[in-house]
Amino acid sequence: MKTVCVGMSGGVDSSVSALLLKEQDYRVVGIYMKNWSRDLPGMKCPWAEDLADAKRVAVKLGIDFEVWDFEEEYRQKVVEYMLAEFKKGNTPNPDVMCNQEIKFKLFYERAMERGADFIATGHYARAVSLARAFATTGANARPLGRELPKANEASPITMGASKEASESDIVLARAKDENKDQTYFSIGFLMKRWRAQFFPLAT
């Protein structure tokens, strides 16, 4: 059985992602990424409540659940970056940096070290195989997005593209729900990681 580590924040999107993957016969492991726990002046960090929500969902779904502490890495890669950009008079985008350095880098690396086959998040985006991206012609031509395959299929890429295919065969594409599309916040990490990434909410 293929194993998927799902980043679970305690919110609806990541919870539904875990449910969809379980329904497709994957061994799902819920992962709460503890990135920040400090209260700021006038602002309480709700990490404990988020963690409790994620745990409750994992229990309800009957899946394993773990907490991975990325606080130090988050401080170095995201917070310090943000403060440095402000000092330069620039407008930083900590969400993009968090995805690039934490959710799609450290999370991916830790999951692979743990022995997972894939990772998944609740982002609204698609990983598209260019090998079959344009399956139709003429007025009906449109890219095909990744769908959730059964757990015994060899690759997470729709229409049979293999893991051994060229990294350039995989590109990031907008989610079908363009009102919720998050591809802008998901840019910036190595294409090879798309091969092990599920976006269950893509469609």
Q: Would you name each region that the model predicts?
A:
Residues 195:
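Short, glycine-/aromatic-enriched active-site segment of Class I SAM-dependent methyltransferases
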Residues 192:
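Conserved catalytic cysteine-centered active-site region
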Residues 1-133, 137, 143, 149-188, ...:
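ATP-dependent adenylation/nucleotidyltransferase module used to activate substrates
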